[in-house]
Amino acid sequence: MPVITLPDGSQRSFDHAVSVAEVAASIGAGLAKATVAGKVDGKLVDACDLISNDATLQIITPKDEEGLEIIRHSCAHLVGHAVKQLYPTAKMVIGPVIDEGFYYDIAYERPFTPEDMAAIEKRMMELIEKDYDVVKKMTPRAEVIDVFKARGEDYKLRLVEDMPDEQAMGLYYHEEYVDMCRGPHVPNTRFLKAFKLTKLSGAYWRGDAKNEQLQRVYGTAWADKKQLAAYIQRIEEAEKRDHRKIGKQLDLFHLQEEAPGMVFWHANGWTVYQVLEQYMRGVQRENGYQEIKTPQVVDRILWERSGHWSNYAENMFTTSSESRDYAVKPMNCPCHVQVFNQGLKSYRDLPLRLAEFGACHRNEPSGALHGIMRVRGFVQDDAHIFCTEDQVKKEAADFIKLTLDVYKDFGFSDIAMKLSTRPAKRVGSEELWDRAETALADALNESGLEWEYQPGEGAFYGPKIEFTLRDCLGRNWQCGTLQYDPNLPERLDASYIAEDNSRVRPVMLHRAILGSFERFIGMLIEHYAGVFPAWLAPTQAVIMNITDKQADFALEVEKSLNGSGFRAKSDLRNEKIGFKIREHTLLKVPYLLVIGDREVETQTVAVRTREGADLGSMPVAQFVELLTQAVSRRGRQESE
C-alpha cells in the first residue's frame, strides 16, 4: 500500500499500485487535466507510470520547466507522425529538445522546402485536433528491433545497436506512428497546441560530415499560445537585430567565401574593436596585469607536451616546414607557460598575471560558423594568473569584481555566476579538489551576489567559474571564465622556489572576461541593435552645414572635436539638411550637429540626438562637456 508524499508534506495512501495520473486525479480534476508527467523520488516519469512503493511525488504541469521540455520533446515526435503521413518513405532519425525548442533529423530523398515545412505544420495541427492519447509501452529489445525492421526504420535500428545493455525500451505510439524514447512524454496531444515550426537546415548522421546528409526540421513549443506569441515576437526582434544585417548597414565588417570564419573588419567596425581593446588594455594594466605577445605558429612538440596534439589536433590548423610540423595556436595558455618558465621564479614573484590579446585559430566545421559569433580566427582577452594555492581565493575574488565592473561598463547588469565542480572522470586528489572548489566558492560568496553550483561540470583537472550575461531580449551569453588548473604547469614543468627553497608547481588560473572580441562585438551589436553608447560608436558626432557658407566653420568644429579625442566627421555635401539628418540617424550616430548662418555668427552648434531630441544651440565647449560626460558614463545608466 504505497504512501505518496507531496511537495507540501501532505500524504496520500493507496491500497494498490497507483499511476501519477491517478494521484493527480485524487487531488483534483483541474490538476489531473494539467498533469504532463511526474517526478517520483526526484526522477521524471510518465503520467501513466505506476508507483508501487512509498515515494515522494511532484506533479509536473506545463508551468514547470520540466513540463515545457516534455511538451517540446513530444512535439518532436509529432513532427515524426506528420512527416510519415505526408512522406511515407522518409526515415526518422532523432528528435531532441534544444534551448527553447526542438528539432527532428530525417533522411529523405530530397531536401525539404518551405512549402514542405508548412505542410508538416498543418498536418501537425490536424493531428493535435484529434486529441488522441499518446500510449507508452515498455517493450523487450528483440520486439523493438522487430517493430522498426517491419517499418524500415534503419536509423532507429542503428540507435538500438548503440544501446546493447538496454533489455527493454520505451516505445511511444502516436496512433499508427511509433517512436523510441526514454521519455517521459505528454499523455495527450492537447498539450501540444502552442507550437510552431521555425526553420529547415541540413545535418549529418552523428554530426560527421563524412556520413549521409539529413534534413533537420526545427520548431518551438510553449505552455500556451500567449507564451508562443511572445517568443515569436522576441525572435522577430532578434532577426531585426541580427549582427550580420546591422554589420552591413553600418559598414562594420564583412565575411566572404574565400576566408570562411575570418572577419574583414571595415573602418567603422575596426574602430569599435580598437575601443574595446584599448579599454581592456587599460583595465588590465590598472589591475596588475603584464601584457605580452606570443607566437602564432608553434612546433607540434609543445602541443604534444601540453596534451593538445592528442586531444585537439583535428581542430588545429597545421603546416610543415623543413621537416618540422607546426600548428597555428588555437589557444594561448601553453605559450604563456613558456614566458613564465623564462628565468627563475620565486614565491615573491607571485601572483604573476600575464595578459595577451591573443590571435587564435580553430578549424571549426563550416556548418557551425555564424557571422562573427562563431568564427575560425578570433582574438581573446586572454590572461593567466600564476599563483600559490593560498593566493587562489583572493585572485578569484579580485577577478570576479573586475569582471562584473567591466560588464556594467558595457551595459550588462544581469549576470549569472556558476561554479562547475568535479566531474566523475578527473585527476588529482579529493583534498586538492576540496581546496580548489572551496577557494572559488568563498570568492563567489565575497561578491555578495547570488550564484549556483553546476555539479560535475568542471574540467577533468579543476573547477571553474562561468559568467553568463542576459541581453535585452532575455538571451543568455556565456562569456567570462575563471578556470583552476594545476595540470598544465605540471605538463610543461612550470615551477617556482618556495619559502623553504623547494621547487613547487604554481596554480594556473585561466581567465577571460569578454571571451573573444569578435563574439562580444556581435553580442553588443545585437544587444544595442547597432545603437552603440557614445563611447563605442564608430562616429560620435557628425557636423552638417546647411549651405556652403558654413563649410569652414563646420571643418573648424570637426578639428576641435577630433583634437579633444573624439571621433567626429563633417558632412559638407550639397544635400538638403533633412536628408543628411535622416541618413546619419539611420547610421545611428549619437549626436548630429547642424550649422547654419546663425550658428556661424554665434559660434555655436545646434545639437540633435539620433533619437530625435533637440538639445538646442550651444557653444562647442559646452558640447564637448556634454559628449565627455556621455563617453565617461560608457554603457551605464546615469543613475549608476
Swiss-Prot record:
Required cofactor names: Zn(2+)
Disulfide partners: none
InterPro entries referenced in this protein's UniProt entry, alphabetically: aa-tRNA-synt_IIb, aa-tRNA-synth_II, aa-tRNA-synth_II/BPL/LPL, Anticodon-bd, Anticodon-bd_dom_sf, Beta-grasp_dom_sf, TGS, TGS-like
Compartments where located: Cytoplasm
Assembly and binders: Homodimer.
UniProt-listed GO biological process terms: threonyl-tRNA aminoacylation
Catalysed reactions, as listed in the record: tRNA(Thr) + L-threonine + ATP = L-threonyl-tRNA(Thr) + AMP + diphosphate + H(+)
GO MF terms held by the record: ATP binding; metal ion binding; threonine-tRNA ligase activity; tRNA binding
Residue numbers binding Zn(2+): C333, H384, H510
Co-factor: note: Binds 1 zinc ion per subunit.
Protein's UniProt keywords contain Lipid biosynthesis: no
Coiled-coil features, chain-numbered ranges: none
The TGS domain, residue ranges: 1-61
Keyword check for tRNA-binding: yes
Protein task: Catalyzes the attachment of threonine to tRNA(Thr) in a two-step reaction: L-threonine is first activated by ATP to form Thr-AMP and then transferred to the acceptor end of tRNA(Thr). Also edits incorrectly charged L-seryl-tRNA(Thr).
EC numbers for this chain: 6.1.1.3
Name of the protein in its database record: Threonine--tRNA ligase
Organism annotation: Pseudomonas putida (strain ATCC 47054 / DSM 6125 / CFBP 8728 / NCIMB 11950 / KT2440)
Gene3D superfamilies documented for this protein: 3.10.20.30, 3.30.54.20, Anticodon-binding domain, Bira Bifunctional Protein, Domain 2, Threonyl-trna Synthetase, Chain A, domain 2
One Pfam family recorded for the sequence: tRNA_SAD
